[in-house]
Amino acid sequence: MRGEIMDYTICREIGKGGFGKVYEVKKKADQKSYALKIETNAPKAGRNSIINEIQAYSELQGCEKIPRLVDHGSYEGLTFLVLPLLKYSLKDLLERHPRFFTKKSATIVGKKLLNAIEFIHGKGRLHRDIKPENVMFGHNNRIYLVDFGMSAPYLRGDGSHIPEVGGKSVSGTLWYMSINTHRGIEQSRRDDLESLFYLLILLYKSRLPWMEPGASVSKKQEARTKEIKENLSVYDLCDGIHGKEHLIKFFQHISSLEFAEKPNYRYLNSLLDKIFHSNKELQGYKRAPKKEDTGLIRTSLWHKFISILSPFEVKYDG
């Protein structure tokens, strides 16, 4: 797409997916850069992910870890939304250097995401697609949780919790979805937190046992991933992580939750604090590299990222 969309001039395409495309745009009035997400085709009858995302962002304004909804509207019958232009995703960082994270920096990311998830849940919503692609870093050195196209309320109009039902189609991203989601059980708060747990394991160990880079998402791949998750013990999954006893308790709390039960976010946060303050590092850089090191991200991006994570002490919000 070239040219203009309403009050915005299109600069370049920066992303795409089943929903449509994302463009870097400039607002005509002030020439500031933003990210504009728009459908590529008018949706057929049923769920419209961008309209759903607009609704979610509208409900979630007020959390510093959720991007501000700048604008939204319709252009030639296609729905669009406008958000601040963020720099890069956690996925970008991991692809450039899989062993980038120390235990402490990974734990800080986990604490910030836990805080964002608690806020989302407090507004009666689920994210339903926690993964590295949806964790972004902004120009103000903040971590943001983005992409609410798959988000859904877990509370009904009368304030009651949605019922637990089976036979649901699988939704989310294969590597990070919960075991219950694999089993076709309706998602609730516990499922977002299980996805966060898997993301933490990825940051601590640089991989997940069921990940097969480049593998196509198929019924066979889905079944194989489900089987590994069901049969692999949390003790084996956390093996090699110093402070693993706290991470094991993190998972055990999540897996013990009933469908409609409220998680104990404060307890989960305290477990991450204990991991953070355990003495040894598992992997990753222990210090910033020397200036003469000219690797792709080992200098400038490292120092940028350290500024994001400083100070290390992340307080519990709420």
UniProtKB/Swiss-Prot annotation:
Catalytic function, reaction form: L-seryl-[protein] + ATP = O-phospho-L-seryl-[protein] + ADP + H(+); L-threonyl-[protein] + ATP = O-phospho-L-threonyl-[protein] + ADP + H(+)
Key words, A-Z: ATP-binding, DNA damage, DNA repair, Kinase, Nucleotide-binding, Nucleus, Serine/threonine-protein kinase, Transferase
Main localization (coarse): nucleus
Cell location: Nucleus
EC number(s) reported in the record: 2.7.11.1
Pfam family, one: Pkinase
Highest taxon of the lineage: Eukaryota
Entry annotation: catalytic residues: D129 (proton acceptor)
Coiled coil: none
SUPFAM superfamilies: Protein kinase-like (PK-like)
Sequence positions that bind ATP: I14, G15, K16, G17, G18, F19, G20, K21, V22, K37
Family under the similarity heading: Belongs to the protein kinase superfamily. CK1 Ser/Thr protein kinase family. Casein kinase I subfamily.
PANTHER family assigned: CASEIN KINASE-RELATED (PTHR11909)
Function noted in UniProt: Involved in DNA repair. May regulate the activity of protein(s) involved in double strand break repair caused by gamma rays.
Protein name from the UniProt record: Probable casein kinase I homolog ECU11_1980
